[in-house]
């Protein structure tokens, strides 16, 4: 069989990976020589150091150790599968394995930085308090679709829907949101972290996957995770009565192993990841029902706002495209234009 020729991009990628793994006898910060290369998983990020869990200890349970980062590696985030070398008590990460997915958010300068890697599914958590907004939900869905991460909508705090604490209009809004996203084919799970309702179904969904919980502050993400990880010390913030907004309680990124199988990455940065890195075309792809019909428009560069023979506008008019979804789609596209103008 003839040898397959590699493309220039493949050759460059191979050279880059090889350069990252050269000089395997690199010295530790204290001058000691390091051992052979080992595979590991980044389970926590603490400033300039990360905590790594070994992956290739077939006879022993995984070990955990602090590792320094090579300056030439770039960003290392929780969820990364890496190659490291160790001395007696710590190690140095010498390579990052290719990622299946990367969640990013802008830093204080507007530059995108990764916050989590190799995520399989996004648990979009919704509750009646604080009041949910479909625009935020649709932003999460658009990111998940483009990253090919499976989205699951988690409707939490069901106990409040049966109480007098919640206005009936908000309760109806939550019910309508659930109906809308179910009709689009998204999986919706009803839970109550307080009494444990729905957690068995949630455990089955989390098993054998690496998941991230996202959503507004105060919807109960940390409370749910604590129910699933009763032996872990996870900070929980109460809903603020004064401003009706939950406080961010997680201060660093960390990966937890569920006892029933599967992992969870929790990080304050993940809650803020956005759509700055998506183009209008990718936003269109992120709305599954718009994606399916946008190619039927008369004009290839159709903005789906005013053009004649626009399949998207026709779908809104005949009721096959929900008007709220269309409005959110247009708002997101406009927000990208605003960011580009500011840049």
From Swiss-Prot:
One of its GO terms (cellular component) is cytoplasm. It comes from the Bacteria. Binds 1 zinc ion per subunit. Its cofactor is Zn(2+). Residues 1-32 are annotated as: Disordered. It is an enzyme of class 3 (hydrolase). InterPro entries: G_CP_dom (IPR030378), NA-bd_OB-fold (IPR012340), P-loop_NTPase (IPR027417), Ribosome_biogen_GTPase_RsgA (IPR004881), RsgA_GTPase_dom (IPR010914). Its main location: cytoplasm. Zn(2+) binds at residues 297, 302, 304, 310. Pfam families: RsgA_GTPase. Residues 109-273 form the CP-type G domain. One of its GO terms (molecular function) is rRNA binding. Signal peptide: none annotated. It is found in: Cytoplasm. Monomer. Associates with 30S ribosomal subunit, binds 16S rRNA. HAMAP family: GTPase_RsgA. One of several proteins that assist in the late maturation steps of the functional core of the 30S ribosomal subunit. Helps release RbfA from mature subunits. May play a role in the assembly of ribosomal proteins into the subunit. Circularly permuted GTPase that catalyzes slow GTP hydrolysis, GTPase activity is stimulated by the 30S ribosomal subunit. This is Small ribosomal subunit biogenesis GTPase RsgA. The lineage of its organism: Bacteria, Pseudomonadati, Pseudomonadota, Gammaproteobacteria, Cellvibrionales.
């Amino acid at each position: 069989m003839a040898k397959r020729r590699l493309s220039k991009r493949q050759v460059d990628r191979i050279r880059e990976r090889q350069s990252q793994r050269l000089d395997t006898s690199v010295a530790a910060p204290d001058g000691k020589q390091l051992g052979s290369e080992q595979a590991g998983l980044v389970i926590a990020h603490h400033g300039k150091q990360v905590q790594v869990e070994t992956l290739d200890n077939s006879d022993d349970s995984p070990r955990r150790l602090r590792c320094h980062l090579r300056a030439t590696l770039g960003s290392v985030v929780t969820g990364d599968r890496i190659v490291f070398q160790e001395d007696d008590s710590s190690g140095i990460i010498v390579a990052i394995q290719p990622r299946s997915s990367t969640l990013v958010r802008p830093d204080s300068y507007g530059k995108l930085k990764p916050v989590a890697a190799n995520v399989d599914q996004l648990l979009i958590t919704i509750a009646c308090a604080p009041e949910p907004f479909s625009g935020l939900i649709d932003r999460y869905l658009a990111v998940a679709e483009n990253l090919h991460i499976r989205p699951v909508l988690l409707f939490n705090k069901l106990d409040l829907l049966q109480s007098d604490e919640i206005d009936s209009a908000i309760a109806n809004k939550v019910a309508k949101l659930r109906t809308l996203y179910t009709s689009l084919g998204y999986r919706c799970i009803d839970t109550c972290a307080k009494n444990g309702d729905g957690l068995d179904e949630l455990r089955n969904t989390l098993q054998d996957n690496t998941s991230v919980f996202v959503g507004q502050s105060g919807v109960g993400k940390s409370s749910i995770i604590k129910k699933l990880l009763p032996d872990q010390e996870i900070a929980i913030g109460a809903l603020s009565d004064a401003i009706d907004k939950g406080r961010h309680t997680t201060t660093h990124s960390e990966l937890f192993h569920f006892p029933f199988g599967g992992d969870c990455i929790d990080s304050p940065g993940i809650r803020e990841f956005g759509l700055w890195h998506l183009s209008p075309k990718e936003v269109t792809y992120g709305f599954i029902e718009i994606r399916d019909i946008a190619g039927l428009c008369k004009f290839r560069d159709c903005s789906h706002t005013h053009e004649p023979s626009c399949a998207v506008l026709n779908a809104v008019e005949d009721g096959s495209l929900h008007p709220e979804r269309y409005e959110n789609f247009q708002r997101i596209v406009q927000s990208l234009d605003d960011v580009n103008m500011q840049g």
